[in-house]
From Swiss-Prot:
Positions with a binding annotation for a divalent metal cation 5: 34, 36-37, 50
Lineage: Eukaryota, Metazoa, Chordata, Craniata, Vertebrata
Name this polypeptide is given: Metallothionein-1C
Pfam families tied to this protein: Metallothio (PF00131)
Gene responsible for this protein: MT1C
Domain comment as written in the entry: Class I metallothioneins contain 2 metal-binding domains: four divalent ions are chelated within cluster A of the alpha domain and are coordinated via cysteinyl thiolate bridges to 11 cysteine ligands. Cluster B, the corresponding region within the beta domain, can ligate three divalent ions to 9 cysteines.
Domain of life (superkingdom): Eukaryota
């Protein structure tokens, strides 16, 4: 398990398709955590790749 992972499900990070790693600090999945990121989002600034419009963001709200 990634020591930087704050995920509560399973023993490893699993963020494909959704942001289950709320802190986005897991090197193994942080790039797929956020579907979108508003300007100034500290979580996504740590490495999340934004894949949608910021007005639909749920992981950095």
């Amino acid at each position: 398990m990634d020591p930087n992972c704050s995920c509560s499900t399973g023993s490893s990070c699993s963020c494909a398709g959704s942001c289950t790693c709320k802190a986005c600090r897991c090197p193994s999945c942080k790039k797929s955590c956020c579907s979108c990121c508003p300007v100034g989002c500290a979580k996504c600034a740590q490495g999340c790749i934004c894949k949608g419009a910021s007005d639909k963001c749920s992981c950095c709200a």
